[in-house]
């Protein structure tokens, strides 16, 4: 099979993975409108082509939280990574490390912090949810600090799980889910051998270490469902800010006022994100939300963005819309499921090449030169002008 883009990895992953796993990573909430808009809105952003600029000294390097990045990309926190490839978090982290970008470990990873951190040279980032069990949160923070994690990514857009209809149909949840998953696994031999048999243990490493017992998929669903905390407020986050002395990033911002609150709170960064369309369907895509947020807080706080990014051109688009760095989620997971560490490494090389093409043809020699001037019509107050015709069409 020829691999030339993330879409090729997606097609391969769909063949390799049991349906319950593929649709868990590929699906979104409700009718998946926001999931689709994330990709489609970003693809509508038009860039200005500029020529004869002498781009021989082009550079993708950037700095974030005093870390040097080979390009303005980090791997996003993705739960259950170790179910998509054998010890998947370790493989993805190694690929990111070799490319000179950060890897973010999810709270609900298969591999625990203590397994992933020693496998790479650069400090990884750690993602934490807002949970009722504050003892677990403190324990996770202590372990992250002990392992040398440099940045905390605090996810705030999951006070309750989203309604993901695909999961019920695919076997991730719903009637007879365990039996359906078993039948799917035995009919996907490549995954069954590589991950199902040789990727054990399939515990949720960070949780089982705290609970003191193995935690499988059913435990994951049950424990998380009982621990999401809808009562959380900015006030409740103060003890985390006091406890964590490294950079802290608030993930799940879609409104300029929430971005301003993050600045007032003292966060070091925000992630403009709708959780990949997996939480509230019908909210703005990240591409639409980003310009107004950048207009409100650019320069006061680091702005990261995710949701809908599938290639290097999308990275350039997000930066032109106001992001400093982007997070890759599904794109790297497709590659991981297909070819493990080598797949992720190849995807990152593709993204780097695609960025270089886009920057060369827009006349941006450095990341700092990718601005709203790189867009065909600049920025509107709420969404890029290049998206305005589409928005009008949707309203008709």
Swiss-Prot record:
Active site per UniProt: 275 (proton acceptor)
Disruption phenotype: Cells lacking this gene lose the ability to grow on L-lactate as the sole source of carbon and energy, but can still utilize D-lactate.
Any one annotated GO CC term: plasma membrane
Recorded GO MF terms: FMN binding; L-lactate dehydrogenase activity
Catalytic activity: (S)-lactate + A = pyruvate + AH2
Cofactor: FMN
Cellular compartment(s): Cell inner membrane
Topological category with respect to the lipid bilayer: Peripheral membrane protein
InterPro entries per UniProt: Aldolase_TIM (IPR013785), Alpha-hydoxy_acid_DH_FMN (IPR012133), FMN-dep_DH (IPR000262), FMN_HAD (IPR037396), FMN_hydac_DH_AS (IPR008259), LldD (IPR020920)
Regulation (activators, inhibitors): Is activated by 2-fold in the presence of high concentrations of sodium and potassium ions. Is almost completely inhibited by a high concentration of pyruvate (10 mM).
Enzyme class name: oxidoreductase
GO biological process assignments: aerobic respiration; L-fucose catabolic process; lactate metabolic process
Primary location: membrane
Binding-site list for substrate: 24, 129, 164, 278
Induction or repression: Is induced by aerobic growth on L-lactate, but not by aerobic growth on D-lactate or glycerol or by anaerobic growth on glucose.
Domain FMN hydroxy acid dehydrogenase: 1-380
EC annotation from Swiss-Prot or TrEMBL: 1.1.-.-
Family per similarity comment: Belongs to the FMN-dependent alpha-hydroxy acid dehydrogenase family.
Protein's job: Catalyzes the conversion of L-lactate to pyruvate. Seems to be a primary dehydrogenase in the respiratory chain. To a lesser extent, can also oxidize DL-alpha-hydroxybutyrate, but not D-lactate.
Subunit structure: Forms homooligomers.
Protein name per the record: L-lactate dehydrogenase
Species the sequence originates in: Escherichia coli (strain K12)
